[in-house]
């Protein structure tokens, strides 16, 4: 994938998103969509992620992150597109 077509988005997800398999499901979905980056729980009960891929891949991942797995209850998703020199090789749960 050309760097010119690579997008990076930083995401914070709020709601009932810890203890419901959100990160594990996010990794599975990321692999299905072909995006790279990472996802982790934060001490305040939110989930943080960085998603990298084409605009279409990133948009599809953001759409999924807004819903999450069946047990999750996403209340809010904040995302910010950013420029990042680092290129991730895969999508990991931190």
From Swiss-Prot:
All copies of domain Acylphosphatase-like, residue ranges: 8-94
Q: Which reaction does it catalyse?
A: an acyl phosphate + H2O = a carboxylate + phosphate + H(+)
Cysteine disulfide links: none
Q: Which UniProt keywords apply?
A: Hydrolase
Kindly list the organism's lineage. Bacteria, Pseudomonadati, Pseudomonadota, Betaproteobacteria, Burkholderiales
This chain belongs to the protein called Acylphosphatase
User: What's the source species for this entry?
Assistant: Bordetella parapertussis (strain 12822 / ATCC BAA-587 / NCTC 13253)
Q: Which PROSITE patterns match?
A: ACYLPHOSPHATASE_2, ACYLPHOSPHATASE_3
A single GO molecular function term of this UniProt record:
acylphosphatase activity
Checking InterPro entries in the record gives: Acylphosphatase, Acylphosphatase-like_dom, Acylphosphatase-like_dom_sf, Acylphosphatase_CS
- NCBIfam families per record: PRK14424.1 (NF010998)
Q: Which residues form the active site?
A: 23, 41
What SUPFAM superfamilies would the database entry show? Acylphosphatase/BLUF domain-like
Family to which this protein belongs: Belongs to the acylphosphatase family.
EC number(s) given by UniProt:
3.6.1.7
**Enzyme type, top EC level:** hydrolase
